[in-house]
C-alpha cells in the first residue's frame, strides 16, 4: 500500500471500522491523479461521477456571480475530500453545484461513483461511511452559512486559521477576501487593524 492510500485509509478508519481486505479492495478501485495549478476539475452543471481526496495541494469551491467575480464557499486542503455537492445522492448523471479549482499543483485520489456504490452495498460499514461523508459536507455548509450570517467579518477572519491552518501563506489574499465576502482593500485594512490591536496589548 502506498503512503497516499495510507492517508486515505486513516481518514476512513477514524470514522468507521473496516477490515484490511475491505480497505485493499477499496484502494484497488481508486486511482491517484494529478492536476495543474489553476485547473478546474469539477465544473458547475457538468455530470459528476467521482469525488476526490486531497493528498497534496489546495482547492477552492466557488461559483461565478452575475457581476463578473466569483464567490468562494470553502477551501479544501490535505486530508480533505472534494465534491461538487451533487454526488451524495448516489444517482447517475448528477450535475455539480460548484466549481472546484486547484490553487496549487494537486495530487489526489479519485474515487469513482461506482466505487462508492460498491462500498455502500457490499462493505459491512459502507453505508455508514457514505452517510458520514454526506453529513460532513452538509454540516460544513451549514456552519459556513451560520458564521456568515451571525459572525462579524473580524470573527470569521480570526477563525480562518483554525479552519484552514497555514492557508494564508499559500493562497492569494483576494481569495481570502472572496471567502469572507469583502474586498481585498477591506481585508488589507482589517489585517492592519488586527496587527495594531495586538501591538497595543
Enumerate the language-model features and the residues they cover.
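Short phosphate-coordinating micro-motif centered on Lys-Gly-acidic
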Residues: 41-46
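Glycine- and acidic-residue-biased ligand/ion/polar-headgroup-sensing regions
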Residues: 38, 49-62, 77-80
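Short, Lys/Arg-enriched N-terminal segment that forms or immediately precedes the first helix
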Residues: 8, 136-146
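Cyclic nucleotide-binding regulatory module and flanking cytosolic helices
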Residues: 1-31, 87-89
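Short, Lys/Arg-enriched anionic-surface-contact patches
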Residues: 79, 143-156
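Cyclic-nucleotide recognition modules
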Residues: 72-131
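Phosphate-/nucleic-acid-contacting segments
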Residues: 151-201
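A generic structural motif
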Residues: 62-64, 103
Amino acid at each position: 500500500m502506498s503512503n497516499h492510500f495510507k492517508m486515505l485509509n486513516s481518514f476512513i478508519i477514524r470514522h468507521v471500522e473496516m477490515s484490511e481486505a475491505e480497505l485493499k479492495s477499496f484502494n484497488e478501485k481508486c486511482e491517484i491523479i494529478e492536476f495543474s495549478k489553476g485547473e478546474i476539475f469539477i465544473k458547475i452543471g457538468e455530470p459528476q461521477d467521482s469525488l476526490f481526496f486531497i493528498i497534496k495541494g489546495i482547492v477552492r469551491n466557488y461559483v461565478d456571480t452575475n457581476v463578473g467575480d466569483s464567490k468562494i464557499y470553502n477551501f479544501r486542503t490535505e486530508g480533505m475530500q472534494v465534491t461538487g455537492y451533487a454526488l451524495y445522492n448516489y444517482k447517475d448523471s448528477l450535475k455539480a453545484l460548484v466549481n472546484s479549482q486547484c490553487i496549487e499543483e494537486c495530487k489526489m485520489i479519485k474515487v469513482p461513483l461506482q466505487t462508492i456504490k460498491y462500498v455502500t452495498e457490499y462493505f459491512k460499514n459502507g453505508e455508514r461511511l457514505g452517510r458520514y461523508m454526506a453529513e460532513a459536507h452538509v454540516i460544513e455548509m451549514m456552519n459556513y452559512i451560520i458564521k456568515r450570517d451571525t459572525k462579524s467579518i473580524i470573527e470569521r477572519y480570526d477563525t480562518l486559521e483554525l479552519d484552514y491552518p497555514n492557508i494564508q501563506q499559500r493562497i492569494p489574499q483576494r481569495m481570502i477576501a472572496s471567502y469572507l465576502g469583502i474586498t481585498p482593500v477591506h481585508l488589507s485594512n482589517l489585517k492592519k487593524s488586527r496587527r495594531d490591536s495586538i501591538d497595543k496589548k
